[in-house]
Each structure stands twice: as structure tokens, then as C-alpha cells.
């Protein structure tokens, strides 16, 4: 095969294959494990909660965020039909956190062990 043909094939072939996006690296056992859980639709405990759902949080009735830690990061994308870009907030035990974009209120509930975490 001539050098020109090889060069043209390299130009036409993407630098990655689509398999890159679907298969973990062969030396990454954790990635393979995560992929198997996703394929079988099994929830792994070490990933934590999937999504917090419920009513829009207000000062009188905030969204309760459970955690075995003293703070947790939550993502807010709005509510009540008015969505906004995702904003990430650190919710701590001391006081409720209010989203500056939509006004939704989040409050951390510290729990003593992993066995007490609610699943949504």
C-alpha cells in the first residue's frame, strides 16, 4: 500500500473509535465493575443517592438532604416549571442553603451511619 493511501486512511479514520466510549480500559477493574453495574441496572451503594426528588423546598418546608458527613454537595436545576442551569451548592448542618437562582431551600440532616440513608 502506498504512503499516500495510508496517509489518506489515517486522515479519514477518527482518532478514536466508538468503542472507547462504551468499553473501559483493559487495565481498569473499577471501570469494568461500574460498567457492569450500569448494564445490569444495579445501584451501587458507594455511589450514594441517585436523585433527590420531591416538592419545591421553602423556608418552612426545605428539601431534606441526608448525609453521613457534615456537608454535602447538591445540584439545583429549579422547580415549579421554571428550570435554570444547574447550580451546585454545599449544604452544611449549621443553616439551610438557598439557591440564588430560584430560591429553593435545602437543609442537611446528619445521620449516624450508612444504614440509615433513605433511598429515593
UniProtKB/Swiss-Prot annotation:
Pathway involvement of the protein, from the record: Energy metabolism; oxidative phosphorylation
Q: Which Gene3D superfamilies match?
A: Cytochrome c oxidase, subunit Vb
| Blocked amino end (Ser) modification, residue list | 2
Subcellular location(s) of the protein: Mitochondrion inner membrane
Q: Which GO terms describe its biological process?
A: mitochondrial electron transport, cytochrome c to oxygen; response to bacterium
Instruction: Spell out the molecular function terms from Gene Ontology.
Output: metal ion binding
Q: How the protein sits in the membrane?
A: Peripheral membrane protein
Q: Its GO CC terms?
A: mitochondrial inner membrane; phagocytic vesicle; respiratory chain complex IV
Q: Which residues form the signal peptide?
A: none
The superkingdom of the source organism is Eukaryota
- InterPro entries in alphabetical order: Cyt_c_oxidase_su5b, Cyt_c_oxidase_su5b_sf
**Keywords, comma-separated and alphabetical:** Membrane, Metal-binding, Mitochondrion, Mitochondrion inner membrane, Zinc
Which is one Pfam family of this protein?
A: COX5B
* Binding residue positions for Zn(2+): 76, 84, 99, 102
Q: What does this protein do?
A: Component of the cytochrome c oxidase, the last enzyme in the mitochondrial electron transport chain which drives oxidative phosphorylation. The respiratory chain contains 3 multisubunit complexes succinate dehydrogenase (complex II, CII), ubiquinol-cytochrome c oxidoreductase (cytochrome b-c1 complex, complex III, CIII) and cytochrome c oxidase (complex IV, CIV), that cooperate to transfer electrons derived from NADH and succinate to molecular oxygen, creating an electrochemical gradient over the inner membrane that drives transmembrane transport and the ATP synthase.
Give the record's subunit note.
Component of the cytochrome c oxidase (complex IV, CIV), a multisubunit enzyme composed of a catalytic core of 3 subunits and several supernumerary subunits. The complex exists as a monomer or a dimer and forms supercomplexes (SCs) in the inner mitochondrial membrane with ubiquinol-cytochrome c oxidoreductase (cytochrome b-c1 complex, complex III, CIII). Slime mold cytochrome c oxidase consists of at least seven different polypeptides species, subunits I, II, III, IV, V, VI, and VIIe/s in order of MW.
Q: Which protein are we looking at?
A: Cytochrome c oxidase subunit 5
Q: Which organism is it from?
A: Dictyostelium discoideum (Social amoeba)
Gene field: cxeA
Amino acid at each position: 500500500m502506498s504512503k499516500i493511501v495510508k496517509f489518506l486512511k489515517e486522515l479519514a479514520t477518527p482518532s478514536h473509535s466508538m468503542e472507547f466510549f462504551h468499553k473501559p480500559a483493559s487495565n481498569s477493574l473499577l471501570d469494568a465493575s461500574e460498567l457492569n453495574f450500569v448494564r445490569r441496572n444495579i445501584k451501587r451503594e458507594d455511589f450514594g443517592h441517585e436523585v433527590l426528588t420531591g416538592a419545591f423546598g421553602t423556608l418552612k418546608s426545605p428539601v431534606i438532604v441526608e448525609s453521613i458527613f457534615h456537608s454535602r454537595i447538591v445540584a439545583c436545576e429549579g422547580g415549579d416549571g421554571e428550570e435554570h442551569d444547574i447550580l451546585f451548592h454545599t449544604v452544611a448542618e449549621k443553616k439551610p442553603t438557598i439557591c440564588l437562582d430560584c430560591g429553593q431551600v435545602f437543609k442537611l440532616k446528619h445521620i449516624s451511619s450508612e444504614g440509615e440513608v433513605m433511598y429515593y
